[in-house]
UniProtKB/Swiss-Prot annotation:
The gene is mnmE. It is found in: Cytoplasm. Homodimer. Heterotetramer of two MnmE and two MnmG subunits. InterPro entries: G_TrmE, GTP-bd, GTP-bd_TrmE_N, GTPase_MnmE, MnmE_dom2, MnmE_helical, P-loop_NTPase, Small_GTP-bd. Mg(2+) binds at residues 237, 258. Pfam families: MMR_HSR1 (PF01926), MnmE_helical (PF12631), TrmE_N (PF10396). This is tRNA modification GTPase MnmE.
Amino acid sequence: MTDTIFALSSGQPPAGIGVIRISGPGAGAALSSLAGRLPSPRRATLATLADPRDGTHLDRTMVLWLPGPATATGEDCAELHLHGGRAVIAAVEAALSSLPGLRRARPGEFTRRAFANGRIDLAEAEGLADLLSAETELQRRTALAMAEGALSREVDEWRTTLLQISARLEAALDFSDEDDVGAGDGTQRASLLPPHFAADCISLACSLNTWLDRPRAEPLKEGFRVVLAGPPNAGKSTLFNALVEHEAAITAAEPGTTRDLLTHAAALDGVPFTFVDTAGLRDEGAGEIERIGIARARAAAEKADLILWLGPEGLGPAGRTLWEIAARADDPGAGRKSQCAFHLSAVTGEGMAAFRSALIAHARSALPAPGEAALNQRQHTHLSEVARALEDAAAEQDPLLAAENLRLGRRGLDALVGRTGTEDMLDTLFGRFCIGK
């Protein structure tokens, strides 16, 4: 990373202030070229910026000089706190582009440099990406916990414990080499396992499993997925509109009005939801397009965190958490359900307040607690592999095979925080960031 990058890291102009970040070995020279001198490190300094090509006055503003490695990226950095007009920012960016060795940053490149220089690890970078995309308070607090290293600190402790277990085992193996214990002597080799070896492995695996048993990050990021299902004209779309507080779905007395999935994200009391309205389920009378919609409705139900079933009692999709809903409490002629969780009317509002409260409480119980770190799919997979390796090591009688399982465990922990990884995976992650971050 020998080149120097720059980008607007604040919001798009016009704005009160526009902040341009510069990072790389040429950051100091770039700042000097525009400001005429290099200010004192880490002190906000008022400076007049001029275009190095012709001396044109660009702006009078605050600048910061941040020499590395104790910076966000681990490199020399500079910040220009400009007046946030489009023309001002465009002129300063053009001046920076004219300097040799400087180029515009790609999405996420500042954070990628921070990762490459050891300022953050992969788990913290993933938390930062989630923090930037957070839209609800619950998402923000969970992402912040990850970005501030909640998982990374645990991984460091687990790795230290695992290294201690491994060191005791390796010492026993070294001792066996000196005493020339035969490879085929199973009893003697089993006796080489350190005292409490299996118990130590299981204890560490249990610590990992407490994290594996936590609610996952995906439902929080994507929204707790609630699918409304039932036959045509059961009141699904009316209830859907009431939940999202928007006339998102067309409602009519004609059966089959909804023919495809209609998805809408909404936050209820700070809890993220994804509500899905579906085509009415029926076996007869549906045209070709409606049949496609019905197939999609059944597929959506299989992916739901919760199904709101508005059809005949007991006939809802099996295999997922399901609430029986009688959605026409305002209609005296509508049938009631004996085991119904809720009788309500989205038209009159009857029962809706209690229903919303129950829905929010149910989602909260399935999502990470406020401020609690949560594993994503990648992290969960690696941590599961580590726990399995520890359990295999505990069950192993051959110390050589036990040592190999411990090595696999260490490798999994390293992958968890990005000490090992592939460029493709890193490209995907940092591509989620905006330019200037």
